[in-house]
A protein has these predicted regions:
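Catalytic alpha/large subunits of respiratory electron-transfer oxidoreductases
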Residues: 1-235
Length: 235
Protein backbone atom coordinates (compact mmCIF):
# COMPACT_ATOMS: atom_id res chain seq x y z
CA UNK A 1 0.00 0.00 0.00
CA UNK A 2 1.20 3.52 -0.84
CA UNK A 3 -0.24 6.98 -0.24
CA UNK A 4 0.22 9.68 -2.87
CA UNK A 5 -0.69 13.38 -2.74
CA UNK A 6 -3.62 14.66 -4.73
CA UNK A 7 -2.47 16.76 -7.69
CA UNK A 8 -3.10 20.31 -6.43
CA UNK A 9 -0.08 22.44 -7.22
CA UNK A 10 -1.25 25.66 -5.54
CA UNK A 11 -1.81 23.89 -2.22
CA UNK A 12 0.62 20.98 -1.90
CA UNK A 13 2.94 21.30 -4.93
CA UNK A 14 2.12 17.62 -5.45
CA UNK A 15 4.08 16.91 -2.26
CA UNK A 16 3.19 14.92 0.85
CA UNK A 17 4.88 14.83 4.24
CA UNK A 18 6.28 11.68 5.83
CA UNK A 19 3.68 12.06 8.59
CA UNK A 20 0.87 11.79 6.07
CA UNK A 21 2.53 9.37 3.67
CA UNK A 22 2.90 6.70 6.35
CA UNK A 23 -0.18 7.46 8.44
CA UNK A 24 -1.96 4.46 6.89
CA UNK A 25 0.21 2.22 9.08
CA UNK A 26 -2.14 3.12 11.92
CA UNK A 27 -4.69 0.79 10.31
CA UNK A 28 -2.63 -2.17 11.48
CA UNK A 29 -1.64 -0.76 14.88
CA UNK A 30 -2.17 -3.02 17.88
CA UNK A 31 -3.67 -0.02 19.71
CA UNK A 32 -6.39 0.52 17.12
CA UNK A 33 -9.96 -0.21 18.23
CA UNK A 34 -11.71 -2.66 15.92
CA UNK A 35 -14.91 -3.15 17.91
CA UNK A 36 -16.95 -1.31 20.58
CA UNK A 37 -15.83 -1.79 24.17
CA UNK A 38 -17.72 -1.60 27.47
CA UNK A 39 -16.11 -1.36 30.89
CA UNK A 40 -17.38 -4.04 33.27
CA UNK A 41 -16.00 -4.56 36.76
CA UNK A 42 -13.16 -2.17 35.99
CA UNK A 43 -12.05 -3.95 32.81
CA UNK A 44 -12.72 -3.15 29.14
CA UNK A 45 -14.52 -5.87 27.18
CA UNK A 46 -15.13 -6.05 23.44
CA UNK A 47 -18.82 -6.36 22.52
CA UNK A 48 -20.98 -6.42 19.41
CA UNK A 49 -22.30 -3.15 17.96
CA UNK A 50 -25.91 -3.96 18.84
CA UNK A 51 -25.07 -4.43 22.52
CA UNK A 52 -23.02 -1.23 22.62
CA UNK A 53 -25.73 0.86 20.93
CA UNK A 54 -28.41 -0.48 23.29
CA UNK A 55 -26.27 0.50 26.28
CA UNK A 56 -25.65 3.99 24.85
CA UNK A 57 -29.39 4.47 24.27
CA UNK A 58 -30.16 3.40 27.84
CA UNK A 59 -27.57 5.77 29.30
CA UNK A 60 -28.82 8.69 27.19
CA UNK A 61 -32.41 8.07 28.24
CA UNK A 62 -31.41 7.92 31.90
CA UNK A 63 -29.51 11.22 31.75
CA UNK A 64 -31.26 14.58 31.96
CA UNK A 65 -31.21 16.96 29.02
CA UNK A 66 -28.58 19.17 30.66
CA UNK A 67 -26.38 16.13 31.38
CA UNK A 68 -25.89 15.17 27.73
CA UNK A 69 -22.90 16.52 25.83
CA UNK A 70 -21.24 15.68 22.53
CA UNK A 71 -17.68 16.34 21.37
CA UNK A 72 -17.16 16.05 17.62
CA UNK A 73 -13.80 15.76 15.89
CA UNK A 74 -12.95 18.99 14.01
CA UNK A 75 -11.90 16.81 11.08
CA UNK A 76 -15.34 15.20 10.82
CA UNK A 77 -17.26 15.81 7.61
CA UNK A 78 -20.00 18.41 7.32
CA UNK A 79 -22.57 15.63 7.09
CA UNK A 80 -21.25 13.90 10.22
CA UNK A 81 -21.34 17.13 12.19
CA UNK A 82 -24.86 17.90 11.00
CA UNK A 83 -26.13 14.47 12.04
CA UNK A 84 -24.36 14.73 15.42
CA UNK A 85 -25.99 18.05 16.29
CA UNK A 86 -29.35 16.78 15.00
CA UNK A 87 -29.13 13.81 17.37
CA UNK A 88 -27.99 15.84 20.39
CA UNK A 89 -30.57 18.57 19.90
CA UNK A 90 -33.23 15.93 19.33
CA UNK A 91 -32.36 14.63 22.80
CA UNK A 92 -33.00 18.11 24.20
CA UNK A 93 -29.41 19.28 24.63
CA UNK A 94 -27.41 22.07 23.01
CA UNK A 95 -24.10 20.93 24.51
CA UNK A 96 -22.12 20.12 21.38
CA UNK A 97 -18.70 21.39 20.34
CA UNK A 98 -15.78 20.63 18.03
CA UNK A 99 -13.15 22.91 19.63
CA UNK A 100 -11.45 20.08 21.47
CA UNK A 101 -8.05 21.74 21.99
CA UNK A 102 -9.26 25.25 22.80
CA UNK A 103 -9.44 26.33 26.44
CA UNK A 104 -10.12 30.08 26.26
CA UNK A 105 -13.29 31.17 24.45
CA UNK A 106 -13.42 34.82 25.51
CA UNK A 107 -12.46 36.15 22.06
CA UNK A 108 -14.85 33.98 20.07
CA UNK A 109 -17.07 36.92 19.12
CA UNK A 110 -14.11 38.60 17.40
CA UNK A 111 -13.03 35.48 15.52
CA UNK A 112 -13.95 35.16 11.84
CA UNK A 113 -16.72 32.74 10.92
CA UNK A 114 -14.27 30.94 8.63
CA UNK A 115 -10.67 31.23 9.88
CA UNK A 116 -8.00 31.33 7.20
CA UNK A 117 -4.41 32.41 6.68
CA UNK A 118 -5.28 35.83 5.28
CA UNK A 119 -3.45 35.00 2.06
CA UNK A 120 -3.20 32.13 -0.43
CA UNK A 121 -1.02 29.25 0.76
CA UNK A 122 1.38 29.76 -2.14
CA UNK A 123 2.14 33.32 -0.97
CA UNK A 124 3.38 32.10 2.41
CA UNK A 125 6.78 31.32 0.92
CA UNK A 126 7.05 34.93 -0.29
CA UNK A 127 6.89 36.40 3.22
CA UNK A 128 9.94 38.27 4.45
CA UNK A 129 9.11 37.69 8.11
CA UNK A 130 7.18 34.85 9.76
CA UNK A 131 6.39 34.76 13.48
CA UNK A 132 5.07 31.45 14.81
CA UNK A 133 3.38 31.58 18.21
CA UNK A 134 2.69 28.33 20.06
CA UNK A 135 3.27 26.08 17.08
CA UNK A 136 5.21 22.91 16.35
CA UNK A 137 4.47 23.54 12.71
CA UNK A 138 6.18 20.47 11.24
CA UNK A 139 3.92 18.24 13.32
CA UNK A 140 0.76 20.36 13.06
CA UNK A 141 0.80 21.52 9.43
CA UNK A 142 3.59 19.97 7.33
CA UNK A 143 2.38 21.67 4.14
CA UNK A 144 2.65 25.09 5.76
CA UNK A 145 5.99 24.13 7.32
CA UNK A 146 7.29 23.44 3.82
CA UNK A 147 6.22 26.91 2.65
CA UNK A 148 7.78 28.55 5.70
CA UNK A 149 11.01 26.67 5.02
CA UNK A 150 11.07 28.00 1.45
CA UNK A 151 10.59 31.52 2.79
CA UNK A 152 13.51 31.05 5.20
CA UNK A 153 15.81 29.63 2.53
CA UNK A 154 14.96 32.63 0.35
CA UNK A 155 16.22 35.01 3.02
CA UNK A 156 13.08 35.47 5.09
CA UNK A 157 13.26 35.61 8.87
CA UNK A 158 11.44 32.94 10.88
CA UNK A 159 10.95 33.45 14.61
CA UNK A 160 9.10 31.28 17.12
CA UNK A 161 7.66 31.77 20.61
CA UNK A 162 7.02 28.35 22.12
CA UNK A 163 6.96 26.40 25.40
CA UNK A 164 9.70 24.15 23.99
CA UNK A 165 12.26 24.25 21.21
CA UNK A 166 10.99 22.71 17.98
CA UNK A 167 13.05 20.84 15.41
CA UNK A 168 13.19 22.76 12.13
CA UNK A 169 15.17 22.23 8.92
CA UNK A 170 15.93 25.88 8.26
CA UNK A 171 17.38 28.91 10.09
CA UNK A 172 15.18 30.36 12.81
CA UNK A 173 15.24 32.40 16.00
CA UNK A 174 13.42 30.67 18.84
CA UNK A 175 12.25 32.06 22.17
CA UNK A 176 11.42 29.27 24.63
CA UNK A 177 9.58 29.98 27.87
CA UNK A 178 6.92 28.70 30.23
CA UNK A 179 3.55 27.94 28.59
CA UNK A 180 1.78 30.58 30.68
CA UNK A 181 4.37 33.18 29.64
CA UNK A 182 3.73 33.03 25.89
CA UNK A 183 1.28 35.94 25.93
CA UNK A 184 3.71 38.11 27.89
CA UNK A 185 6.54 37.11 25.54
CA UNK A 186 4.45 38.03 22.51
CA UNK A 187 3.58 41.37 24.09
CA UNK A 188 7.24 42.05 24.82
CA UNK A 189 8.20 41.31 21.21
CA UNK A 190 5.41 43.61 19.99
CA UNK A 191 6.67 46.35 22.29
CA UNK A 192 10.21 45.86 21.02
CA UNK A 193 8.83 46.30 17.51
CA UNK A 194 7.55 49.73 18.49
CA UNK A 195 4.07 49.13 19.88
CA UNK A 196 4.09 51.07 23.15
CA UNK A 197 0.45 50.47 24.04
CA UNK A 198 0.98 47.07 25.64
CA UNK A 199 1.23 47.99 29.30
CA UNK A 200 3.96 46.40 31.37
CA UNK A 201 5.39 43.93 28.83
CA UNK A 202 9.08 44.79 29.09
CA UNK A 203 11.24 43.33 26.31
CA UNK A 204 14.40 41.50 27.30
CA UNK A 205 17.38 40.54 25.16
CA UNK A 206 15.57 37.56 23.59
CA UNK A 207 12.54 39.69 22.70
CA UNK A 208 14.78 42.39 21.21
CA UNK A 209 16.63 39.79 19.17
CA UNK A 210 13.41 38.46 17.63
CA UNK A 211 12.16 41.99 16.98
CA UNK A 212 15.40 42.95 15.24
CA UNK A 213 15.30 39.85 13.04
CA UNK A 214 11.70 40.52 12.03
CA UNK A 215 12.36 44.22 11.43
CA UNK A 216 15.37 43.57 9.22
CA UNK A 217 13.58 41.02 7.07
CA UNK A 218 10.21 42.75 6.93
CA UNK A 219 11.30 46.17 5.70
CA UNK A 220 8.59 46.02 3.02
CA UNK A 221 5.99 45.01 5.64
CA UNK A 222 5.60 41.60 4.02
CA UNK A 223 5.14 39.40 7.06
CA UNK A 224 2.69 37.14 8.85
CA UNK A 225 1.94 35.88 12.36
CA UNK A 226 0.75 32.28 12.64
CA UNK A 227 -0.97 31.02 15.80
CA UNK A 228 -0.53 27.28 16.35
CA UNK A 229 -2.31 24.50 18.20
CA UNK A 230 -0.10 24.92 21.28
CA UNK A 231 -1.24 28.53 21.65
CA UNK A 232 -4.89 27.60 21.11
CA UNK A 233 -4.71 25.10 23.96
CA UNK A 234 -3.41 27.73 26.39
CA UNK A 235 -5.75 29.97 28.42
Amino acid sequence: MRVHPRDNETVNETWISDRDRFSYEGLNSEDRLTSPMIKRDGAWQAVEWEEALILVAERLKAAGDDQIGCLVSPSATLEEMYLAQKLVRGLGSNHIDHRLRQRDFRADAADPVLPWLGLPIAELEQQQAVLLVGSDIRQEQPLLAHRVRKAALDGGAVALINPYRVDLTHPSTQLVGAPDAMLADLGAVAKALGNDGLGGSQPGDAHQRIAEVLKAAGADRKGIILIGALAQSMP
